[in-house]
């Protein structure tokens, strides 16, 4: 009998053992995870982590998992009523993505020397918005992460919590620059790109 769990386990191990054929691994990964729940996939990944999978394999696994679900979300529209919590969550995620893109766009203008007062104000407004996103982070940390950990899923919350802290640190540095009014284009660009990239990847997890 075909065992999806064993197949996925072997597939994840191939990420490390057969790194030259990552595209084929991704294809197989996408095919099998579409037939499984996120909890099933996360449990298998956690089992492999518990077996002391090499750190580089864990990172590769996370990156491929992220790519797969990005592709899946871009291909499939989630058909639920507007009042459904899933619909609300997807819309919130899209809004965060759009704001992240706007932040990176503003950063690009600054790097190119096209800085205006409206750009500075717009970036300050975007930082205010990201301060509000902190509430969602706290919900995840206080409600979702403990729930996952109680069910034996330790690695996913640890990775997401680390990203929360990275975003907080970058956001704090960018806020200090904007509030002080001393704009260093290269530094603002690097911080903005960093925040945007982590935000964009984080919401797919």
Label each PLM-derived region with a short phrase.
Residues 1-205:
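Small-residue-biased structural context
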